[in-house]
């Protein structure tokens, strides 16, 4: 893949859905699938799927469709899921603990190597054999260990400070669960998961049905 190619974020955000469905197809021993069949399963048009995949190369064959395993492997590589990424999690409250206990991260190549919190009652407790550390140790940990991703699960008032420390520690990817839009340098990538915004969208759709 040409890393300089200008591909819209909308296309990138659809790739994980393709990836997930292709994985399910492999589990069901499906060897090949057409763009029409794939579209019917995931709610996209066949044309949309072809356009998305053509951004990264020529994967399908006319009259044959897509080889499921080959397409899965290609998308896996495009998304960077064929590599490993070390992550630190900051905030071991309910959301943080749920994320730390999510077993599928290992399959995505994401390894949570440390967990930090400011609550003295949580420090020393283990989650999946990872001991929760004092938040004051975050800076020194980032200096001594290679970390790719910071997962922020702290309250809004603490999130920007944590983000600044992650950036100063060399992290270039932040997964943010705090209800705030972080201010970061241009070369730092942030993926926000604002739960209130997500549920508000659902409520709006329910409201329109009344």
Swiss-Prot record:
Signal sequence bounds: none
Compartments, record wording: Cytoplasm
Molecular function terms from GO: DNA binding; DNA-binding transcription factor activity
DNA-binding region: 17-56
Transmembrane intervals: none
Domain of life assignment: Bacteria
GO biological process: negative regulation of DNA-templated transcription; response to redox state
Annotated binding of NAD(+), by residue: 91-96
Matching InterPro entries: CoA-bd (IPR003781), NAD(P)-bd_dom_sf (IPR036291), Rex_DNA-bd_C_dom (IPR009718), Tscrpt_rep_Rex (IPR022876), WH-like_DNA-bd_sf (IPR036388), WH_DNA-bd_sf (IPR036390)
GO cellular component: cytoplasm
Pfam families: CoA_binding, Put_DNA-bind_N
Keywords: Cytoplasm, DNA-binding, NAD, Repressor, Transcription, Transcription regulation
Key word Transcription regulation present: yes
Family that this chain belongs to: Belongs to the transcriptional regulatory Rex family.
Physiological role: Modulates transcription in response to changes in cellular NADH/NAD(+) redox state.
Family matches, as NCBIfam families: PRK05472.1-3 (NF003989), PRK05472.1-4 (NF003990), PRK05472.2-2 (NF003993), PRK05472.2-3 (NF003994), PRK05472.2-4 (NF003995), PRK05472.2-5 (NF003996)
Quaternary state and interactors: Homodimer.
Protein name: Redox-sensing transcriptional repressor Rex
UniProt organism field: Clostridium botulinum (strain Alaska E43 / Type E3)
